[in-house]
């Protein structure tokens, strides 16, 4: 039986994950779903954001459905005990190196975007972000007395940006394969003009391209990519980039769509086992109010069905149900436009179930 680890986390995580679970149960499939604490909830229950039992469950499961972690009240904890360390730990222990962040603007929601509707209506970008390398994980790092330079002897913070050839090759293959199934256009985003790491990145991606002649490859500096995402976002199909640039660009692309509350994400290992979560955070300011948008989490469950569980038809059912609900005019507050019906978290989940 397919086993899904359900990790709601903190803030609105419990509310939105409950709606995704409700939708999954409506499909008529037989899933074994087991829930465990993570993030701040893990710290409260077991003294660590990623308790051993939770990690064991995640390793045993076929897929992980994740909510969100984080709360201001944990900001004073040592870094290793903060809720955000849970997601970093899961990525590391499960070797989740490929992050898929779709940025889709449904025609019904074009008016909710801060951009002109004609710029974003019909937008469909997939950002493929490398998750386990780059400056976020490079060693050495820390705080020390500066060994040289104008301020030698002064305290300085330092990090190390690095990528190995195997890391670049495997994410490039994932991105080219994704592009081959879509519009056959891949844009590799780097900063090769000033960073040795990303000149190396560019060289390796160019070499991998030889295996995918049907895909059109372009290269773009990250500063220009940030501008072009605002100026002409529909020129992009699939974007591949490193950990830090992907972190920033995927959030920028998300806001083109009108609400980050609509956007799912997937983090995959080499065998397509994945962790699926909404692109947004735990939003502690609205937790418990029943107003959070559950659609990103519901669509994350659809991605789980498609990429890990091999049930593309069921994924299509969920995605089509979401489109139907939007066409019917149901909106949570974050995507509300004049003339639509405002609903809460549970009501939106119920509407998707009804559409199914």
UniProtKB/Swiss-Prot annotation:
Binds 1 Mg(2+) or Mn(2+) ion per subunit. Pfam families: Iso_dh. SUPFAM superfamilies: Isocitrate/Isopropylmalate dehydrogenase-like. GO terms for molecular function: 3-isopropylmalate dehydrogenase activity; magnesium ion binding; NAD binding. InterPro entries: IsoCit/isopropylmalate_DH_CS, IsoPropMal-DH-like_dom, Isopropylmalate_DH. Signal peptide: none annotated. The keyword Cell membrane does not apply. Its main location: cytoplasm. The record marks 136, 191 as: Important for catalysis. Substrate binds at residues 91, 101, 129, 223. Mg(2+) binds at residues 223, 247, 251. It is found in: Cytoplasm. Pathway: Amino-acid biosynthesis; L-leucine biosynthesis; L-leucine from 3-methyl-2-oxobutanoate: step 3/4. It catalyses: (2R,3S)-3-isopropylmalate + NAD(+) = 4-methyl-2-oxopentanoate + CO2 + NADH. Keywords: Amino-acid biosynthesis, Branched-chain amino acid biosynthesis, Cytoplasm, Leucine biosynthesis, Magnesium, Manganese, Metal-binding, NAD, Oxidoreductase. Its EC number is 1.1.1.85. Catalyzes the oxidation of 3-carboxy-2-hydroxy-4-methylpentanoate (3-isopropylmalate) to 3-carboxy-4-methyl-2-oxopentanoate. The product decarboxylates to 4-methyl-2 oxopentanoate. Belongs to the isocitrate and isopropylmalate dehydrogenases family. LeuB type 1 subfamily. This is 3-isopropylmalate dehydrogenase. It comes from Ralstonia nicotianae (strain ATCC BAA-1114 / GMI1000). The gene is leuB.
């Amino acid at each position: 039986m397919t086993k899904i680890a359900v990790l709601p986390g903190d803030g609105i995580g419990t509310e939105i994950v409950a709606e995704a679970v409700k939708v999954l149960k409506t499909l008529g499939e037989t899933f074994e779903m087991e829930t465990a604490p993570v993030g701040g909830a893990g710290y409260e229950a077991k003294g660590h954001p990623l308790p051993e039992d939770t990690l064991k469950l995640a390793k045993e499961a076929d897929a992980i459905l994740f909510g969100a972690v984080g709360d201001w009240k944990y900001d004073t904890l040592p870094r290793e005990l903060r809720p955000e360390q849970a997601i970093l730990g899961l990525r590391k222990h499960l070797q989740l190196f490929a992050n898929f962040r779709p940025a889709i603007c449904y025609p019904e929601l074009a008016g909710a975007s801060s951009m002109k509707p004609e710029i974003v209506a019909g937008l469909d970008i997939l950002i493929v972000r490398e998750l386990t390398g780059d400056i976020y994980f490079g060693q050495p790092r820390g705080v020390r007395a500066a060994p040289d330079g104008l301020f030698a002897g002064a305290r300085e913070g330092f990090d190390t940006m690095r990528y190995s050839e195997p890391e670049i090759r495997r994410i490039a293959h994932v991105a080219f394969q994704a592009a081959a199934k879509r519009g056959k256009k891949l844009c590799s985003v780097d900063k090769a003009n000033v960073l040795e790491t990303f000149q190396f990145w560019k060289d390796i991606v160019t070499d991998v391209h030889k295996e995918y002649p049907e895909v059109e490859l372009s290269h773009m500096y990250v500063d220009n990519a940030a501008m072009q995402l605002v100026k002409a976002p529909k020129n992009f199909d699939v974007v591949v980039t490193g950990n830090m640039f992907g972190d920033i660009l995927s959030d920028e692309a998300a806001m083109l769509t009108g609400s980050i509350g609509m956007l799912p994400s997937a983090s995959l290992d080499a065998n397509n086992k994945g962790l699926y979560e909404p692109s947004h955070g735990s939003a502690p300011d609205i937790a418990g109010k029943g107003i959070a948008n559950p659609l990103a989490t519901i669509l994350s469950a659809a991605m789980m069905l498609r990429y890990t569980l091999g049930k593309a038809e069921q994924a299509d059912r969920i995605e089509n149900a979401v489109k139907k609900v939007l066409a019917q005019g149901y909106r949570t507050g974050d995507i509300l436009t004049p003339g639509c019906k405002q609903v809460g978290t549970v009501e939106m989940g119920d509407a998707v179930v009804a559409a199914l």
